[in-house]
Amino acid sequence: KLNIYKNFPDEKSFDNLIEKTFTNYYDQWNADYIIERGDWITPYNLKLLQKYFKNNKIKIVILVRDVLDILGSMLNVCRRNAEFYINRQYEFSDKSTVIFEKKEELAEIIMHRDNYIYTVLYSINNLLKENTFKDYIFVEYNDLVSKPDITLKNIYNFFDIKHFKHDFNNVKEFEVNGIKYEDSVFGGKLHKLKTGKLERQEYQIKVPQRVVDKYSGLEMWRKINNEK
């Protein structure tokens, strides 16, 4: 396959195109403030931000949660949705290579280094270890659910934007410009939100102790906060 860029390396024009990505994407959004959601803390993505937005203040909020809770939440989606992509990965796997019960095998797929949770964990670890980018805060999921008003005010203060009064008794599904998440592509409801009053949902997922032992204590951001 030919490398077109090397054939005509117009780097300045490509840089100009990339620098205007956010401006062009959000050009028709009717909003005073837009907080971009994405995997911006991966080492590669963060370098891109720093390269193309070096004249802007980059601030990142990192939503974190107990890793075992995340794993349990994903296993709960597996339990409720037979066609969920994690279940399908398991069903298509070579069963002659399987040594654990199904639930443990599903946990291994979810936590695999090529999947999302591991990507976020190594990105946080790299962020803390390199310590070259410091304009970020961690927001605990438990704080967001148990004391949302205080937590959101902290986020607004971090971004230096005015506070917005929320109705935590009337939480709605996320929708913007008439568009909602279409989770059928995943085979399960990844973004399904309990509408109405904001409160933590409890459910029980039993997994072998090996799984608990393996994925306990991975919340490295808490160790840093405790050291401070």
What would you call each of these model-derived segments?
Residues 13-27, 72-158, 219:
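PAPS-dependent sulfotransferase catalytic domain
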Residues 42-45, 68-73, 145-148, 172-175:
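Short catalytic/ligand-binding loop motif for oxyanion handling, primarily in non-cytosolic enzymes
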Residues 1-52, 84-102, 197, 202-205, ...:
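PAPS-dependent sulfation machinery
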Residues 49-55, 153-158:
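Short, surface-exposed basic-aromatic patches at helix termini and helix-loop junctions that form
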Residues 34-37, 62-64, 138-140:
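Short beta-strand segments
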Residues 30-32, 55-58, 134:
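A general structural motif
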Residues 98-111, 121, 125-134, 149-150, ...:
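PAPS-dependent sulfotransferases, especially Golgi type II membrane carbohydrate sulfotransferases
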Residues 52-77:
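Conserved phosphate-donor/acceptor-positioning beta-strand/loop module used by diverse small-molecule
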